[in-house]
Amino acid sequence: MKRILPLLLLCAAAHAAEPARPATTNAPALAAIDSPEWVAKLPAATNATQLFVVAGIGMDKTTAFVSMHEKGADGSWKQILSTPGFVGKNGLCADADHREGCAQTPIGVYRFNKAFGIAPDPGCAIPYVQVDGNAWWSGDPDRQYNQMVDIRDVPDLVLDDSEHIVDYDYQYQYCLNIGFNEDGTPGRGSAIFLHCFGPQKPWTGGCVAVPKDVMLRVMRSVRADCVVVIDTFERLGASW
């Protein structure tokens, strides 16, 4: 019950803060509202025009307040969506402390550097790859670690260390790779994505997860220059 309560509070806050939007099959009709004051004070906000913020409820908690913001021509920030979300099973950790298999979501400032999914391209501004059964995400330290690979090109990939993307048919309908460990340093961690909620698990293996309908709106709204900020709610200076 202690774990569920923060999520229920987040749900209530998200629904209260964000007006209902009509369903659409094209780009989402985003009823933007003023972003909370703390968003404009984030160091990343100085040069960014779009922010995706993951505010974890605590270092050892699996829930987060997730929001997306855009800067207008006048310099003001507007919140275009907000939702409760999940982070790693073991909470958050400093970027430098992250290790493969730690089941923690790294704290830091990143970019989305790849868009992909099992579903067809929803209209993403970042070049999108619709995957098939040949697509794997390498966790093999000796073969293109932390990259998407085609098994036909890397037939000796260590499969037990890697993710077969189509096996995650709930979570990986739509995905954005968070640019953690872009250098591919073996053992630092791989496959840190933003993806859809998985079934029956209020946590992830280290990724960030949001409801599928929200993920679809993110895919249709995100730009290549979007800055991803992950930290605790408290350290971000967040307040209602």
Regions found by a protein language model. Give the residues of each.
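Sec-dependent signal peptide recognition
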Residues: 1-7
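Hydrophobic h-region of N-terminal signal peptides that target proteins for export
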Residues: 7-17
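Cell wall/extracellular polymer interaction/catalysis modules
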Residues: 21-204, 213-226, 230-240
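Short cysteine clusters
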Residues: 207
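A conserved hydrophobic position in a structured secondary element of the catalytic/binding core
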Residues: 210
